[in-house]
Structures are given as structure tokens and as C-alpha cells.
Curated annotation (Swiss-Prot):
Belongs to the bacterial ribosomal protein bS20 family. GO terms for molecular function: small ribosomal subunit rRNA binding; structural constituent of ribosome. Binds directly to 16S ribosomal RNA. NCBIfam families: S20. InterPro entries: Ribosomal_bS20, Ribosomal_bS20_sf. It comes from the Bacteria. One of its GO terms (biological process) is translation. The keyword Disulfide bond does not apply. It comes from Prochlorococcus marinus (strain MIT 9312). GO terms for cellular component: small ribosomal subunit. PANTHER family: 30S RIBOSOMAL PROTEIN S20, SMALL RIBOSOMAL SUBUNIT PROTEIN BS20C. This is Small ribosomal subunit protein bS20. The gene is rpsT.
């Protein structure tokens, strides 16, 4: 256990940051899954409404990944890889229909 004031403060700050980072990572995963679900919906029923859903969910996922990279929750290469994988899937989904 920490003995001095600054060490106790660092423990408190580290815990706070861990929870914030956990929240960002969880939301990134959730938005990625929603984008994939919307791609599946579009494959089953290709119409303009589903296409808009795919595009808006892609934009939200990209935005949150960029914010996570900016706040050092994700490494920039990790963020780029995630965006690339999602984008390639969306491109193939939209191109096939």
C-alpha cells in the first residue's frame, strides 16, 4: 500500500483513467458490432434505408476510434487497423449489391 500522499493520489488517478479507458474500448467494440450487424441487414435487404444505417454506423465507429486514439486509449496503429478492417468489410458489402 502507498505510504505518501502523492502515491495515494497516483493510485486514485490510475484507477479513474482505467475506468475511462475501459469505457472507450467497450464502446468501440459495441459500435464495431453494430456496424457489422448493419452490414448483414444490408446484405439481406439492400435498400437505401439500410445503406444509410451502414454509413452512419461506420461514421460513428470511425469517430470514436479517432477519439480513443487521440486520448491514448488505443495506439494509433491499432486504431488504423480497426478502421481498415471495418472499412474493407463495409466496402465489400456495399459493392456486392
Amino acid at each position: 500500500m502507498a505510504n505518501n500522499k502523492s502515491a495515494k493520489k497516483r493510485i486514485k488517478i490510475a484507477e479513474r483513467n482505467r475506468l475511462i479507458n475501459k469505457s472507450y474500448k467497450s464502446t468501440v467494440r459495441t459500435l464495431t458490432k453494430k456496424t457489422l450487424e448493419n452490414c448483414e441487414k444490408y446484405k439481406k435487404d439492400p435498400n437505401d434505408e439500410n445503406k444509410d444505417l451502414v454509413k452512419t454506423s461506420l461514421n460513428k465507429a470511425f469517430s470514436l476510434i479517432d477519439k480513443a486514439v487521440k486520448k491514448n486509449v488505443l495506439h494509433k496503429n491499432n486504431g488504423a487497423n480497426r478502421k481498415s478492417k471495418i472499412n474493407n468489410l463495409v466496402k465489400t458489402t456495399l459493392a456486392t449489391q
